[in-house]
Amino acid sequence: MNILLLGGAGSLINQMILKLRKEGHRVFVLTGDRYKKQNYEKVFETYNFPYNSEDLSEIIESVNPDVTLFMGAFDTNYRWDKEEREMVRYTSDLMNILVAHTKIKKDKFILLSSDEVYQGNYEDEIGEDVRPSGTKIRAKTLIQAEEICDNFRNNWGMDILIL
């Protein structure tokens, strides 16, 4: 399978690359940054483009992924030191990525979120029907990202999974 990973360099994405390659998948990486030359494990092809690049659709069509995994909450391209700025950048990048994916209907899109969206105390086990309740800006941004994905799943018929 062709797997497209979207995210900045780090131990998590590198471990995913190793695992996917070991399972025999062809792994591609879109770094999300045009200028930084980051260190990734060996992949079939690395694309150094920002998520808001006009070439994003062409890259995705060229890779023709069976699965696209956006590192999301674990993407090292987002620093979150200036939360309001990162909130806008994160949600607009996700929108650009999803819009670019509307052209190819065959792949599964996976967004990595975080348990940070469930802040607070819960008496019962948290199931799929429990609404997220994050209070901090980063948590609210991740909740908004999940809702954007739900919108694309429902209105565009995309195969989207949020983990």
State what each model feature region is.
Residues 82-93, 132, 136, 140-143:
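Glycine-rich NAD(P)-binding loop of the Rossmann-fold in SDR/ketoreductase-type enzymes
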Residues 68-70, 95-137:
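Conserved Rossmann-fold NAD(P)-dependent oxidoreductase catalytic core, especially the SDR/UDP-sugar
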Residues 25-34:
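Conserved glycine-rich Rossmann-like NAD(P)H-binding loop of the short-chain dehydrogenase/reductase
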Residues 49-89:
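NAD(P)H-binding glycine-rich loop region in Rossmannoid oxidoreductase-like domains
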Residues 120-122, 135-161:
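Active-site Tyr-X1-5-Lys
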Residues 40, 78-85, 120-124:
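Conserved catalytic-core motifs of eukaryotic protein kinase domains, centered on the activation segment
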Residues 34-43:
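Short loop/helix-cap segments at secondary-structure boundaries that form the rim of catalytic
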